[in-house]
Amino acid sequence: MKLCRIGSVGEEKPAIIDSENNYRDLSSIINDFNPDTLNFDTLEKLKKTDISSLPKLDSNSRIGACVTNPAKFIGIGLNFKDHAEEQNLPIPKEPIIFSKFTSCITGPNDPIIVPKGSNHTDWEVEIGFVIGKKAINVSIENALDHVLGFFLVNDVSERDFQKNRGLTWDKGKGFDTFGPIGPFIVCLLYTSPSPRD
């Protein structure tokens, strides 16, 4: 199951991609993909829906961010060995956790606004996860039970601001438009093979 948001900025409609790659309008079932609606109950409701009966959306429409208004946008720094080596940084013994502001979030093809004074704007492809139910002190064995789905993230950074202006990652990663996401959420419950395999 692939979920996305289609339409001009601020007017996106929630959609599901059918087996023939058509965008089907979910507006009659759900108002948007946000923290209130991205949960396992919603997935069950969508699973029971006759997708072919839903109206098609224009396939040439803008693809928006696949999630709107998330409560948090958290990243794990240097989580890929090759990237750490590329940056001449040691592999951390403990995860480096940072936040990106939710104003970073844009659609996957929307323009990125390079900040004034930037001399080293860079990007990394990451995998984002949608947590579909409350999770506190979850064991490694049960972690995937909380993951509703995943999507692509373009983690944009201004490296000079990040490394040379107080070593605060937010300075380099927090600019508006520095977090394009999507084009869609792939729901884990309906992937084959299972991510557990």
Task: Report the location of each language-model feature.
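N-terminal non-catalytic cap/leader segment that marks the start of a structured domain
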Residues: 1-95
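Structural signature of FAD isoalloxazine-binding scaffolds in flavoprotein oxidoreductases
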Residues: 91-108, 121-123
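Flexible glycine-rich active-site/ligand-binding loops centered on an Asp-His dyad
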Residues: 90, 97-101, 142-169, 175-176
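Conserved small/polar residues in nucleotide/adenosyl-binding loops
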Residues: 190-197
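A mid-sequence, solvent-exposed acidic-amphipathic segment
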Residues: 180-186
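Short, structured patches in soluble enzyme cores that scaffold and shape functional sites
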Residues: 100-102, 116, 123-127, 131-133, ...
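A generic local secondary-structure boundary/capping motif
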Residues: 4, 63-65, 85-88, 112-121, ...
